[in-house]
Swiss-Prot record:
Organism: Bos taurus (Bovine)
Active-site residues from the entry: 75, 148
Sequence positions bearing N-acetylalanine: 2
Bias-annotated ranges (Basic and acidic residues): 1-22
Protein name, as recorded: Catalase
Length: 527
C-alpha cells in the first residue's frame, strides 16, 4: 500500500528526492541567525523555568501565534492551480483587450476553485455552488474573472448579499447550520428559484473541480479598438466532460476524504493529466438589450443560447500545482474590478456591488498592500501611481517619485486611450423593487425541458430531503414557490415532505456505553 500512493500523499518524499544529494540547510531564526538546538528550551536547570532570553523559543512562538489570517467570509475552502490561456479564435471585433490580441497568444493564469458557504476545513463534496475564479496576468494589468460553476445566482441585488450569506452560514446562537434560516430566506426571495433548482439538481455536487463548467455569470461589456461596445457573458466548458457525484457517494467522500476535490486536482496536474476548459462568449448589442424581453443584467437569468449562441475564444490549461498553498492559494485575491482596457462592467447590480466588496475584503484579510503579494502582483504590467506606504509595503514604495498629482516632475500621466466607454443612462433615482421580475419562466424551462424524468425525480428528492428539516410554515412557503414554477414541481415535493413529516423521529446514531472497569480503588487512584 505504501508503495502505491498518489503524488499528493507522497509530496514530502518527492520534495526530498528533488534535493537529491544536497545537504540540509542550516536551521535559522526568522532573522537568519543559526539555531544550535531546536528540541530543548533554555531553562535554569533541567526542571527550572524558561528564560526570556530564549530567543529561539520566543521567535518561534511569536510567529506561530500569528500564523492564521482571517479566512474568506465566503469561498473559504478552495484549491488552486496555475497555467495559461491561449487564444484559438479571433474576437478583436468585440474587444481590444490584449489578452485576446491574436490567435495563439498565451497569457499566464491563476485559478481557484472553491465551495461557498463552508469554512476552510469543510468537505469538498457538499451540495453548494462552486467558485470558479480566474486571474489573467496581462500586459495591461490583471484581469480577474470571478465566477461560479453556475450561470445564475440566488439574488439580483447586491444589497441582499450579506443577509443571503448569513442565512447559509451558522445560527448566531447555536452555531449550527440552520435549515430554517436557509429556507426562510429562499422562500421569501423567489428570485432564488432558478439557482436553488440548479443547486439541488445533479450538478449541485460536481465530481471534483475538473468536471464542472465555469461561468462569469454576470453581464460584462466588451469594447473594441474603434470604441464600439457590446454586452457579453463568459462561459468555460470543461474539456473533461461533466461528471457529478451521487448523494450517497458525496456523503461517503465527505467522511472518508473531505479534501477529495483538492486531492483530485493536485494529482491530475502532478501526473501530467492537465485539466482544460474552452472559453466562449455570448454577445448582445446595445440595441438588442433595449428590446430584450427581460433585464439582460439580471443575474438570476440566462441568455438563451438559441438567440445568443456561444462564440469560441480560447482554452484554459492548468499545468502547475502551487509551490506553497498559503503563499499562492490562501493569499490569492480575486477582484472583479480588475479589468484591463477592452473589458468593462455592465449595469448588473450584483456585479456593481462586487466591484467594491471584493477589494474591500482583501484589504481587511490581507492588508492594504495585498497587490504587492507575488501571486496578486500584476507582474506583466509596470505599476506606477500615487499610492504610498501602509502596512507590509514590500516594494521600493516607488522610490523618490512624486506622491501627488498633478505635478511638474515627469511622474506617471493618465492615458486618454484607457478611458472607459461612454455610455448614456437616464431615469429616476430611487430604490426599485425587483423582487417579482418574472422569477419562474426560465425555471419552468429548466424543470420541463433541460431535465429528464429521472433528473426531475432526483431534484425533487434532494429538495425535500433538505427542506424537511425546516419548520412547516416555511415548507409551505417554499412549496408554493415551486408550484408557481409548475404545479407538478410543487406537488411532487409536497408528497415527499408528507412522507417525511409522517415518520416518527428515529435515533440512527449507534453509541458505545462505557461500563465500569475492573480496576481496584487503589489502581484507579494511581491512574
Amino acid at each position: 500500500m505504501a508503495d502505491n500512493r498518489d503524488p499528493a500523499s507522497d509530496q514530502m518524499k518527492h520534495w526530498k528526492e528533488q534535493r537529491a544529494a544536497q545537504k540540509p540547510d542550516v536551521l535559522t531564526t526568522g532573522g537568519g541567525n543559526p539555531v544550535g538546538d531546536k528540541l530543548n528550551s533554555l531553562t535554569v536547570g533541567p526542571r527550572g523555568p524558561l528564560l526570556v532570553q530564549d530567543v529561539v523559543f520566543t521567535d518561534e512562538m511569536a510567529h506561530f501565534d500569528r500564523e492564521r489570517i482571517p479566512e474568506r467570509v465566503v469561498h473559504a475552502k478552495g484549491a488552486g492551480a496555475f497555467g495559461y490561456f491561449e487564444v484559438t479564435h479571433d474576437i478583436t471585433r468585440y474587444s481590444k483587450a490584449k489578452v485576446f490580441e491574436h490567435i495563439g497568444k498565451r497569457t499566464p493564469i491563476a485559478v481557484r476553485f472553491s465551495t461557498v458557504a463552508g469554512e476552510s476545513g469543510s468537505a469538498d463534496t457538499v451540495r453548494d455552488p462552486r467558485g470558479f475564479a480566474v486571474k489573467f496576468y496581462t500586459e495591461d494589468g490583471n484581469w480577474d474573472l470571478v465566477g461560479n460553476n453556475t450561470p445564475i445566482f440566488f439574488i439580483r441585488d447586491a444589497l441582499l448579499f450579506p443577509s443571503f450569506i448569513h442565512s447559509q452560514k451558522r445560527n448566531p446562537q447555536t452555531h449550527l447550520k440552520d435549515p430554517d434560516m436557509v429556507w426562510d430566506f429562499w422562500s421569501l426571495r423567489p428570485e432564488s428559484l432558478h439557482q436553488v433548482s440548479f443547486l439541488f439538481s445533479d450538478r449541485g455536487i460536481p465530481d471534483g473541480h475538473r468536471h464542472m463548467n465555469g461561468y462569469g455569470s454576470h453581464t460584462f461589456k466588451l469594447v473594441n479598438a474603434n470604441g464600439e461596445a457590446v454586452y457579453c457573458k463568459f462561459h468555460y466548458k470543461t474539456d473533461q466532460g461533466i461528471k457529478n457525484l451521487s448523494v450517497e457517494d458525496a456523503a461517503r467522500l465527505a467522511h472518508e476524504d473531505p479534501d477529495y476535490g483538492l486531492r483530485d486536482l493536485f494529482n491530475a496536474i502532478a501526473t501530467g493529466n492537465y485539466p482544460s476548459w474552452t472559453l466562449y462568449i455570448q454577445v448582445m448589442t446595445f440595441s438588442e438589450a433595449e428590446i430584450f424581453p427581460f433585464n439582460p443584467f439580471d443575474l438570476t437569468k440566462v441568455w438563451p443560447h438559441g438567440d445568443y449562441p456561444l462564440i469560441p475564444v480560447g482554452k484554459l490549461v492548468l499545468n502547475r500545482n502551487p509551490v506553497n498553498y498559503f503563499a499562492e492559494v490562501e493569499q490569492l485575491a480575486f477582484d472583479p474590478s480588475n479589468m484591463p482596457p477592452g473589458i468593462e462592467p455592465s449595469p448588473d447590480k450584483m456585479l456593481q456591488g462586487r466591484l467594491f466588496a471584493y477589494p474591500d475584503t482583501h484589504r481587511h484579510r490581507l492588508g492594504p498592500n495585498y497587490l504587492q503579494i507575488p501571486v496578486n502582483c500584476p507582474y506583466r504590467a509596470r505599476v506606477a501611481n500615487y499610492q504610498r506606504d501602509g502596512p507590509m509595503c514590500m516594494m521600493d514604495n516607488q522610490g523618490g517619485a512624486p506622491n501627488y498629482y498633478p505635478n511638474s516632475f515627469s511622474a506617471p500621466e493618465h492615458q486618454p486611450s484607457a478611458l472607459e466607454h461612454r455610455t448614456h443612462f437616464s431615469g429616476d433615482v430611487q430604490r426599485f423593487n425587483s423582487a417579482n421580475d418574472d422569477n419562474v419562466t426560465q425555471v419552468r424551462t429548466f424543470y420541463l425541458k433541460v431535465l429528464n424524468e429521472e433528473q426531475r425525480k432526483r431534484l425533487c428528492e434532494n429538495i425535500a430531503g433538505h427542506l424537511k428539516d425546516a419548520q412547516l410554515f416555511i415548507q409551505k412557503k417554499a412549496v408554493k414557490n415551486f408550484s408557481d414554477v409548475h404545479p407538478e414541481y410543487g406537488s411532487r415535493i409536497q408528497a415527499l415532505l408528507d412522507k417525511y413529516n409522517e415518520e416518527k423521529p428515529k435515533n440512527a446514531v449507534h453509541t458505545y456505553v462505557q461500563h465500569g472497569s475492573h480496576l481496584s480503588a487503589r489502581e484507579k487512584a494511581n491512574l
